[in-house]
A protein has these predicted regions:
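Amphipathic alpha-helical dimer-interface segment in Rossmann-like NAD(P)H-dependent oxidoreductases
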Residues: 54-72, 111-112, 116, 172
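Active-site helix of classical SDR
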Residues: 63, 99, 107
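Conserved mid-core segment of classical short-chain dehydrogenase/reductases
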Residues: 34-49, 72, 92-95, 135-140
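C-terminal substrate-recognition "lid" of short-chain dehydrogenase/reductases
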Residues: 60-63, 156-185, 190
Length: 192
């Protein structure tokens, strides 16, 4: 599909969805990248720029084109994927954490701006799950992932399907009053 950090790619994705389905009831902004671990004083301009380009601009450009379609339909729901790092700190991951905090902020802002027009915007903040993002951090072995999982009260990583199930629950018609929320899917990490 292309580089999600580019506005034109986001516009093309929304146009393609509307052309194929005739409308856009739900949109999920789930592109994200991590960076090699480094403390704040070692962050480079390239690391910071790329984190914000993909993790923030990708979400904002997606919403820029999703929202007008939903406003014309008089309804819609946008689900942004932030991260547990977007609710707290991330040692040696400051650029990633800052970008994911920005996703939570734009989620809340858009929820306030468009809620009265029946366009809801929420975000989920998942704990680690065995996906490609762990390869960037060097946690691509079963042993390393098991160690990461020990950071959760459930003593394991999130299964990707558990994250999807949470999204489906939040996107369901019976959940139509939830708006502007960032929900942790973390096995209880934020309860500590």
């Amino acid at each position: 599909a292309g580089d999600i950090a580019l506005e034109s790619v986001n516009q093309s994705l929304v146009d393609a969805a509307v052309n194929q389905f005739g409308r856009l009831d739900i949109a999920v902004n789930n592109a994200g990248i991590a960076h090699q671990p480094a403390p704040v004083h070692q962050m480079t301009e390239d690391i910071i720029d790329r984190q914000f380009a993909v993790n923030v601009k990708g979400v904002m450009f997606g919403m820029k084109y999703q929202i007008p379609v939903m406003l014309a339909q008089k309804q819609g729901h946008i689900m942004n994927v932030s991260s547990l790092a977007g609710l707290g700190g991330a040692p040696k991951g400051a650029a990633y954490a800052a970008a994911k905090h920005a996703v939570a902020g734009v989620t809340r802002t858009a929820a306030v701006e468009y809620g009265r027009k029946n366009v809801r915007v929420n975000a989920i903040c998942p704990f680690y799950s065995p996906t490609n993002i762990l390869n960037v951090d060097g946690y691509n072995t079963p042993e390393a992932q098991a160690q990461l999982g020990m950071g959760s009260p459930m003593k394991r990583l999130a299964d990707p399907q558990e994250i999807v199930n949470t999204m489906l629950l939040l996107l369901s018609p019976g959940n139509s009053y939830m708006n502007g929320q960032t929900i942790a899917v973390d096995g209880g990490v934020t309860a500590w």
